[in-house]
Amino acid sequence: MNNLNLIPVIPEIFLAAATCAILLIDLFLSDAKRYLTYVLSLATLVVCAVLSLSDFNAGATSYSFGNMFVSDPMSNLLKFCTYIAVGLTLVYSRQYLEDRQMVNGRLGGEFYILSLFTVLGQMVMMSANNFLIIYLGLEIMSLSLYALVAFRRDNAVAIEAAMKYFVLGALASGFLLYGISMLYGATGSLDLTEVARVIATGAVNKPVLIFGLVFVVAGLAFKLGAVPFHMWVPDVYQGAPTAVTLMLGGAPKLAAFAITIRLLVEALPALAIDWQQMLTILSVLSMAIGNITAIMQTNIKRMLAYSTISQVGFILLGLLSGVVAGADGSTTNGYGAAMFYVITYVLTTLGMFGVIMLLSRAGFEADNIDDFKGLNQRSPWFAFVTLLLMFSLAGVPPVVGFYAKLAVLQAVLSTGQIWLAVVAVLFSLIGAFYYLRVVKVMYFDEPADKAKIVASKDVTVTLSINGAALLALGLVPGPLMTACAAAIIKTLAS
C-alpha cells in the first residue's frame, strides 16, 4: 500500500524543522546570548516528547511513505526515552561546555545542533520498516556523532578518538550494508515485513541468507559495542570530551536496540535459531571481557566503557531469550526485559557521567577514580547519588539495576538455559568489585582537594531527580516493566 500519511512522521518533521531554525537563529546570536540555543534545544525536545507520548498512549500502529516508516508503541516509548536522555545530557553538559569555551566563539551552538541531528537519526532508526530507512537513520546519527567526537579540534586525543570512531564506524556500516544487500538479493525486497514473509515461504537461498545474517549481526554488534567488535569503545569514551562521551553512551544504545529488534526479530524470525546462537557467543564474550578488563582500569571513563561492554552482554541475553511470536509469555520476558534493561541502563549512565562533569572544572578533568576520593566529605548528597548510581550498575537492590538484571535472568531461565544464567551471575559478581571500589574511595579515602563542590541549581536538581528515579523505579519497577512488555507485544503483533 503506497500511502503518504504524514501524521506518524510529525515528531520527525517538527524536530528537523526546529533544528534547522535553531541553526539559523544561532548564527545571529552573540556569545552572551548563546544560552538561547540551549533553551530552544531543550524546548524542542519537550515538544517532541509530548508528541511521541501522545502517540504511545494511543497505542496504535500506523505507517507512512509506502510502509517504509512505522509509528508503533515500541518506537514511541523508545523515542520518549531518547528525548529524556538527550535532554539530561544537555543539562549536565552546559556548564562543562561553557568552562571549556565549546559553546561560544567560533564553535557557537554547534554542540546543541549536532545533538538534535543525532536525535533525528535515532528517531528514524526506531521507526524504520525498511532496510534503506534503517541505514539512512544510522548514517544521520553516526555522522553527527563523528563530528561531536572531533569537536575539540585543538585536542589531539579527541581527534585521535574521532579518527578511530570514524574508521571503525564506517567499517560497521559497511558490514551492515553488505549484509542487507545479501538479504535483499535473497528475498527481492527491502521491506522488513515482506522479507519475513518471503523467508517464511522457504523459497529462498538459505546459504545467502545466513551469509547476510552474519554481516548484519556483526554490524549491529559494532554499534552496540559487543565483543569482539568493541575495540573503539574504550578509546573513544576516554578520548572524547566527557559531554560527548555521554552523548555516545546514552541515547544511541536505545536506537541500536530498536534496529536490532527490527532487523532480527521482525525481519528474520525464521532465522531465530541462527542469530540466537550468534548472540549467545557475543553475550558471554562481552560479559567476560568487559567485566574482567574493567577491574584493571584507573581511568573512570575507560572503566565505564568496559562496563558498557559488559552491560551490552546482558542486553543481548534478553534478546536471545525471546521467543518469536511465543504464546507462553517468553516474548514478554525476553524482549521486554531487554528493553527495560537498556532504558534503565541509559538512565544510570546519564547520571554517572553527570557526576563526572560535576567534579570537572575549567582546566581539570575528573577522569580518574582517584578524583572521587573523599567525595562524601566534599558533598554528602552527591556522594549518595553516586552511591545509588554505582549500586544500580552493579545490580544491588533496591536500586533499579537489580530488577533489570533479575528480569533478564528470569527470561533466560524461562528458556531452560541455566548455564547461561549462571555465567551471567558469576560475571555480575565480578563486575560488582569495580563498581563498589568507587563507593569505597568516596566514603573511606581522604580527598586530595577538600573544597566543597559548587553546582548550578539546574544540575543539582536534575542529578537529584535522576538518582531518585533510579531508586523509585527499583522500589516500584512494575509500571515501566509493564509498559516495555506491552510495547513489545503490540509491536510484534502488528
From Swiss-Prot:
It comes from the Bacteria. GO terms for molecular function: NADH dehydrogenase (ubiquinone) activity; NADH:ubiquinone reductase (non-electrogenic) activity; quinone binding. It is an enzyme of class 7 (translocase). It is found in: Cell inner membrane. It is a multi-pass membrane protein. Belongs to the complex I subunit 2 family. NDH-1 shuttles electrons from NADH, via FMN and iron-sulfur (Fe-S) centers, to quinones in the respiratory chain. The immediate electron acceptor for the enzyme in this species is believed to be ubiquinone. Couples the redox reaction to proton translocation (for every two electrons transferred, four hydrogen ions are translocated across the cytoplasmic membrane), and thus conserves the redox energy in a proton gradient. The chain crosses the membrane at residues 9-29, 36-56, 73-93, 107-127, 131-151, 166-186, 209-229, 241-261, 278-298, 304-324, 339-359, 382-402, 416-436, 469-489. PANTHER family: NADH DEHYDROGENASE. GO terms for biological process: ATP synthesis coupled electron transport. NDH-1 is composed of 14 different subunits. Subunits NuoA, H, J, K, L, M, N constitute the membrane sector of the complex. This is NADH-quinone oxidoreductase subunit N. Its EC number is 7.1.1.-. One of its GO terms (cellular component) is plasma membrane. InterPro entries: NADH-Q_OxRdtase_suN/2, ND/Mrp_TM. The gene is nuoN. Keywords: Cell inner membrane, Cell membrane, Membrane, NAD, Quinone, Translocase, Transmembrane, Transmembrane helix, Transport, Ubiquinone. It catalyses: a quinone + NADH + 5 H(+)(in) = a quinol + NAD(+) + 4 H(+)(out).
